[in-house]
Amino acid sequence: MKLLLMSRIDSEETLAYTRTLGIDLENVGFQIIYDTATASALEVNGVPLSSADPDAVVAIGGDGTILLCIQQMNIQRPIIGINRGEVGFLADLEPEEAFSFLKELKPGFPVERRMRIDLSVDGKPLGTALNEAVIVTSRPAKMLRFSVLVDGVRAEQFRGDGLLISTPTGSTAYAMSAGGPIIDPRIEGFLLVPLAPYMLSSRPHLICATRTLAVRLEASKPAHLVLDGQRTIDLGDQATIEMTRSPEPAQFIDVNRNFFSKVEQKLRNL
């Protein structure tokens, strides 16, 4: 089997761990390749993640590394994260157990598919998010005015600092910090969480993933759209952001662990 290793490159300890893990996996018969950035840091040959064809991808770092990895894949490959960050809700393995798990990986391993969101602005495709898309004001202390449309029908109108649109996977990330609920990732839907809404009646909404969702900026105030904390797009006046369930979900290697048990453990360690 061919595994691609992608490491956070701002940590010498993580890079050293990645180098050792790659050697150990090669010694038990795996073909190991590295993405370009990791390879450069390790001074070995690498391949762009966008054109690589591994059987699985191993992301070594925090949730940001895993999100970046998924963003860079043109075709979604099975992925597993090794936590070398702070919390690591998306990382299913800790460093001390990773080699023992990976060396037993065989073709046909189980995969859990996670919903992603395709986004466009005024009809122009922008990209895909696994955790969340966040619409925020570009000017601190200046509120935005939104309309939320579901299948073309206005369902909500409010003012606030911004609006967070999350997947169930992202419900343990920014959405949780903003007061949203924790959602089982096997559920598919759009979680809308207002950020500092002016009216207390503006509450989180969970909308079925089969619906088409749009958010319209109702006033001419500068705003940004941020995808998974990785990419920021300037929004024009009175822009409309359209969202649909992506036909290509993320694929996480299933380690057969209870989601809520993992969440409880991660939250306890905060």
Swiss-Prot record:
Cofactor(s) the protein needs: a divalent metal cation
Keywords: ATP-binding, Cytoplasm, Kinase, NAD, NADP, Nucleotide-binding, Transferase
GO cellular component, one term: cytoplasm
Gene Ontology biological process terms in this record: NAD metabolic process; NADP biosynthetic process
Gene3D superfamilies registered for this protein in UniProt: Probable inorganic polyphosphate/atp-NAD kinase, domain 1, Probable inorganic polyphosphate/atp-NAD kinase, domain 2
EC numbers on record: 2.7.1.23
GO molecular function, one term: NAD+ kinase activity
Active site: 63
Stored Pfam families: NAD_kinase (PF01513), NAD_kinase_C (PF20143)
Localisation per UniProt entry: Cytoplasm
Positions annotated to bind NAD(+): 63-64, 131-132, 142, 159, 161, 172-177, 196, 230
Family, as annotated: Belongs to the NAD kinase family.
Protein task: Involved in the regulation of the intracellular balance of NAD and NADP, and is a key enzyme in the biosynthesis of NADP. Catalyzes specifically the phosphorylation on 2'-hydroxyl of the adenosine moiety of NAD to yield NADP.
Protein name: NAD kinase
The species this protein was found in: Methanosphaerula palustris (strain ATCC BAA-1556 / DSM 19958 / E1-9c)
Record lineage: Archaea, Methanobacteriati, Methanobacteriota, Stenosarchaea group, Methanomicrobia
Gene name in the database record: nadK
